[in-house]
UniProtKB/Swiss-Prot annotation:
It is an enzyme of class 2 (transferase). It comes from Cellvibrio japonicus (strain Ueda107). One of its GO terms (cellular component) is cytoplasm. It catalyses: N-acetyl-L-glutamate + ATP = N-acetyl-L-glutamyl 5-phosphate + ADP. Its EC number is 2.7.2.8. Catalyzes the ATP-dependent phosphorylation of N-acetyl-L-glutamate. Keywords: Amino-acid biosynthesis, Arginine biosynthesis, ATP-binding, Cytoplasm, Kinase, Nucleotide-binding, Transferase. This is Acetylglutamate kinase.
Amino acid sequence: MSLSRESAMNIANVLTEALPYIQRFTGKTVVVKFGGNAMEGEALQNSFARDIVLMKLVGMNPVVVHGGGPQIGSLLEKLNIKSEFINGMRVTDSATMDVVEMVLGGTVNKQIVSLINRNGGQAIGLTGKDGQLIRAKKLTVTHKTPEMLAPEILDIGHVGEVQSVNTAVIDMLINSDFIPVIAPIGVGEDGASYNINADLVAGKIAEFLRAEKLMLLTNVSGLQDKQGNVLTGLSTEQVDALIADGTIYGGMLPKIACALDAVKGGVTSAHIIDGRVDHAVLLEIFTDAGVGTLITNKPKA
């Protein structure tokens, strides 16, 4: 069955619109944080995997970093291990860390690897412990109430922050035409494992790789102003101002701060995109309009 003239022209227009972007980004590295609603449902999962495979086929170097908070919570519940959060971070004792490693480094990581491979890619899964990819240190959290004379330092267990990234491991995989899929688990100097926020890991990997783009898939349509309008293009100075005036607050603040730090650290652009949209990654990279918020270091975005 042949296409109608209108359908054929629509396909041709899409391809020609994508061409300059393909030419511009060939050979460039793009770090994509996969999580949230984008991980739920077979259709969105396959949409994401095909986007990643197509990026590789047209000469880009996608690097996937994934989360897995709901899956961790589900297994902890089955094992009757209590989940506790402080400042949005999971308190991670030794028993919880074992579960985190099983879920992130085992189940979720291999599911994503399999998903990409089934859609025609060549993915290899690893955690930050492999090849000492992610060197981490213990994250300390402070807590203060008006009644306290000095802030209290809280121990939240095996929760870490990125100290350094061994980019040679990632470069080796990229140069061998593999797609790295990375679980956000770091390793300390003493060999201890650390649970690290996946957005922060993605941002730091993008920074150390000097990536062209950092893309964070979220459950919202992008960064919004106080009237609920999506802000499609922002400079780092504009983002700083939106944080200062309270437009960016709450749960969105850590994600935006991660994107902001990456761009200030040398990543060309960061993108907050709606993971609930089919082929959101391709639409953001290869179309003029995009489907989210672009943050750059340019005076005007």
